[in-house]
Each structure stands twice: as structure tokens, then as C-alpha cells.
Amino acid sequence: MGAQGAPLSHSIAAVNPLASQSVEFVGSFPDPRVRVDPPLPEIAFIGRSNVGKSSLLNALVGRPGLARVSGSPGKTTLLNFYRLSRLYLVDLPGYGFARSSKSARAGYRKLLHGYLETRQTLAGIVWLLDIRRDLSREDREMRELLTESARPVLPVFTKADKLTRSALHTRERELAQALDLTPDQVAVTSSRTGTGIADLAESVLAAALREAS
């Protein structure tokens, strides 16, 4: 993805290394400069509203209901921090909700810019994209922003269970190509069936450990 930093590696794992760790909700914060203790590597999760971000976070840590699945997309405007033993998972607000006001969109951009620019402990970003959907204008804008941030990014295609196997491979190839990537540079997941969850958890943990070393 252009001038961004080294991509998060796409790992292969038989067992989810995050599901066995204790996890707690730290809090929701409006200030991207918030200090959390202890200072641990952070992995941020970002995607369009309704991309399945909360469901994926719950699947990653093996805790159904930890991250609340909102019935009102576009309402979350805070940074949600979850602490595991060696890292934080940070749930960033979803983007692209059609009913958001102009002021809400401006506030979102300010929050996101502030987070990407100021977090010294940010080890990487997991960017979620619905595998059934082509890139939207908002997705392309997010791609530019992530590239400019020079942070490590792993694109993750969600909702793989919604497609047949043949359609899944086709969409994986098409969407990766739209990002100027190859299929081995992205991850494909399903929170419902568990497809790709252990591999993604391994990638997340590896990125955090590299930041800590």
C-alpha cells in the first residue's frame, strides 16, 4: 500500500494465541492523546460502519459480548481500549455512515488524524473491509490516510461466510488487486465460522511483540 510502513505480517496459526489471555475493557476515550497504564503496544482496528468490527474483536479474544455490537451504526465516536497481558486492542470508530452530519465527519477525521499521528505505542492497524463490497470513496480516502501515516497495516476481509468458496476466492483476488496487493498480503476472516481468526490473532500478537522488543 504505497509509502506506508512495513505491512503487518499475515501469519498462519493452528491455535488462537489471544483467546487464552485475560482481557479487560479499559475505557472509552475522546482524546487520542490519552495515556493508558501500563504503556503497552497498541493494535488498532478500523473499518466502515457495519463491517463487523465488534464481532471480529470478540472472536479474536474469545469473549462474546466484550465489544458491544451496536444496533446504531455510526454512533460510536470514542476510542475503546481493551487490555490483554501484552498489548492493547483499540477499537476505532467506524467511518462512512451515510447519516453522519458534516460536523460529526469532521470530528471523526480530527480524532483519527490525532490518533495516527500521536500514538507512539501504535504497533499496527488492522483495516477491515467487507469482502462482498467494492472499495467505496470512503475506503479509498481511508487508504490514502493510512498510507500517509506510514503505519504498518494489514487489510482484513470480513464476512467470508457470506460467499460460496468459489466466489470467495474470486472476491479475495479482486479486492486485493484493487488495493494493489496480492492475496497473500491480506487476511480473510469470518467471525461466525472462525475462518482466519487464529491466523489474524497470531499476526496481531507478532506485531505487538515486535514493537515491544
Residue spans for each PLM region:
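Conserved G1/Walker A P-loop phosphate-binding module
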Residues: 5-99, 209
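Canonical P-loop GTPase G-domain recognition
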Residues: 20-33, 162-213
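Conserved nucleotide-binding/hydrolysis micro-motifs of P-loop NTPases
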Residues: 30, 75, 87, 94-96, ...
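Switch II of P-loop NTPase G domains
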Residues: 35-37, 71-80, 93-123, 131-145
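Helical mechanochemical/support elements of P-loop NTPase systems and associated helical scaffolds
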Residues: 39, 65, 78, 104-108, ...
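Structured catalytic cores of enzymes that bind and process phosphorylated ligands/cofactors
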Residues: 43-51, 55-57, 68, 80-81, ...
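Conserved C-terminal guanine-recognition region of P-loop GTPase G domains, centered on the G4
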Residues: 113-184
